[in-house]
Amino acid sequence: MQIREIHFCEVCGSPYVELHHVVYRSENKNLENCKLNFVYLCQEHHRGTYGVHGSKGARLNRKLKLEFQNKLEELLDKQYLTREEINNILQIDDKALNRLLKRFSIQDYKYIKEDIIRACMDGKLIM
């Protein structure tokens, strides 16, 4: 018998949740299966008026994206990282990782931290 993980809404703590991709799949399909890109939200905070997909949800969407960006800043703890180090953090399949990194030049088999974060954020860093 497998024990199921219990998740709660990141905003209000409700136990009735839906999986949300912080960086939308339409923005960056490469992170579709990256657990760092997942948050759990109740129906109201996911699809409600003030939810991330709602007509007045821009503030919450921006907040979650900034938290994701900050998490990447923290986990990508060196200025230059190898492909393996990046994959250990993002834990995405090889094909997705190749697509994510293909447009960047490497120096001594390493990628620049800011380039990686920018790629994960669909080219838009939150300031």
Q: Residue locations for each model-derived region?
A:
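Short cysteine-rich loop/turn motifs with clustered Cys
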Residues: M1-E18, V39-E44
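Short, charged surface segments at domain edges that flank catalytic/cofactor-binding sites
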Residues: M1-F8, N30-E32, N70-L72
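Short linker/helix segments within small regulatory modules
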Residues: V23-F38
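Short Cys/His-centered divalent metal-binding micro-motifs
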Residues: N37-R62
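Short, amphipathic alpha-helical "recognition" segments used to contact nucleic acids or chromatin
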Residues: K63-L81
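Short alpha-helical "recognition helix" segments of helix-turn-helix
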Residues: E84-L90
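Helix-turn-helix DNA-binding helix
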Residues: L97-N98
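Short Lys/Arg-enriched helix C-cap and helix-to-coil transition segments
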Residues: K102-M127
